[in-house]
Amino acid sequence: MTRLIFLGPPGAGKGTQAQILAEHLHIPHISTGDILRQAMKEQTPLGIKAQSYVDSGELVPDQLVQDLVEERLEQADAKSGWILDGFPRKVTQAAFLEELLQKTGQGGERVVNLDAADDVVVARLLSRGRKDDTEEVIRRRLEIYRSDTAPLIDYYSDRQKLLTINGDQSQEEVTHELKATLGS
């Protein structure tokens, strides 16, 4: 049973690789951004709460994101495995997830760190041509990633769950290395 958590800086290719691998393994690619948007669109109780934060320009609180992730991992299609993308972002969320997976008998997860150099990530994100992706904004997002999310690398490394993949490679090379490393 495959349970993977994808980490890496913005522009490292997490979403792309998670989707490719999820299709290859026939398991759901669970993106926290997607489940948040879906819950708001469907006006679920959690979605209504989240919408109030989004409408007021605030970050959705950790507890609400954790509740959404828990709800999603309890769905039938996630019982045979999953790939999480965009969660956890902090060590406190990782501890929550670890406890949740133990409680639900879904342990054995592995963590894929798509490690990409800042200059590579900046070039990739600038090439997307989004007007809000200026070099200054991208470098700020990288700073936030390094300070908030990077401690997860140590957290999972200490638990011998971390696989690091060179995210500087082409999409095809990363996919090949991922499949080879995971034996899929």
Swiss-Prot record:
<feature type="binding site">
    <location>
        <position position="128"/>
    </location>
    <ligand>
        <name>ATP</name>
    </ligand>
</feature>
<comment type="similarity">
    <text>Belongs to the adenylate kinase family.</text>
</comment>
<comment type="function">
    <text>Catalyzes the reversible transfer of the terminal phosphate group between ATP and AMP. Plays an important role in cellular energy homeostasis and in adenine nucleotide metabolism.</text>
</comment>
<keyword id="KW-0963">Cytoplasm</keyword>
<dbReference type="GO" id="GO:0044209">
    <property type="term" value="P:AMP salvage"/>
</dbReference>
<feature type="binding site">
    <location>
        <position position="37"/>
    </location>
    <ligand>
        <name>AMP</name>
    </ligand>
</feature>
<dbReference type="GO" id="GO:0004017">
    <property type="term" value="F:adenylate kinase activity"/>
</dbReference>
<dbReference type="GO" id="GO:0005737">
    <property type="term" value="C:cytoplasm"/>
</dbReference>
<dbReference type="Pfam" id="PF00406">
    <property type="entry name" value="ADK"/>
</dbReference>
<feature type="region of interest" description="LID">
    <location>
        <begin position="127"/>
        <end position="133"/>
    </location>
</feature>
<dbReference type="InterPro" id="IPR000850">
    <property type="entry name" value="Adenylat/UMP-CMP_kin"/>
</dbReference>
<feature type="binding site">
    <location>
        <begin position="86"/>
        <end position="89"/>
    </location>
    <ligand>
        <name>AMP</name>
    </ligand>
</feature>
<feature type="binding site">
    <location>
        <begin position="11"/>
        <end position="16"/>
    </location>
    <ligand>
        <name>ATP</name>
    </ligand>
</feature>
<dbReference type="InterPro" id="IPR033690">
    <property type="entry name" value="Adenylat_kinase_CS"/>
</dbReference>
<dbReference type="GO" id="GO:0005524">
    <property type="term" value="F:ATP binding"/>
</dbReference>
<feature type="binding site">
    <location>
        <position position="169"/>
    </location>
    <ligand>
        <name>ATP</name>
    </ligand>
</feature>
<comment type="pathway">
    <text>Purine metabolism; AMP biosynthesis via salvage pathway; AMP from ADP: step 1/1.</text>
</comment>
<keyword id="KW-0545">Nucleotide biosynthesis</keyword>
<feature type="binding site">
    <location>
        <position position="93"/>
    </location>
    <ligand>
        <name>AMP</name>
    </ligand>
</feature>
<protein>
    <recommendedName>
        <fullName>Adenylate kinase 1</fullName>
        <ecNumber>2.7.4.3</ecNumber>
    </recommendedName>
</protein>
<keyword id="KW-0067">ATP-binding</keyword>
<comment type="subunit">
    <text>Monomer.</text>
</comment>
<feature type="binding site">
    <location>
        <position position="130"/>
    </location>
    <ligand>
        <name>AMP</name>
    </ligand>
</feature>
<keyword id="KW-0808">Transferase</keyword>
<feature type="region of interest" description="NMP">
    <location>
        <begin position="31"/>
        <end position="60"/>
    </location>
</feature>
<dbReference type="InterPro" id="IPR027417">
    <property type="entry name" value="P-loop_NTPase"/>
</dbReference>
<feature type="binding site">
    <location>
        <begin position="58"/>
        <end position="60"/>
    </location>
    <ligand>
        <name>AMP</name>
    </ligand>
</feature>
<feature type="binding site">
    <location>
        <position position="32"/>
    </location>
    <ligand>
        <name>AMP</name>
    </ligand>
</feature>
<keyword id="KW-0547">Nucleotide-binding</keyword>
<feature type="binding site">
    <location>
        <position position="141"/>
    </location>
    <ligand>
        <name>AMP</name>
    </ligand>
</feature>
<keyword id="KW-0418">Kinase</keyword>
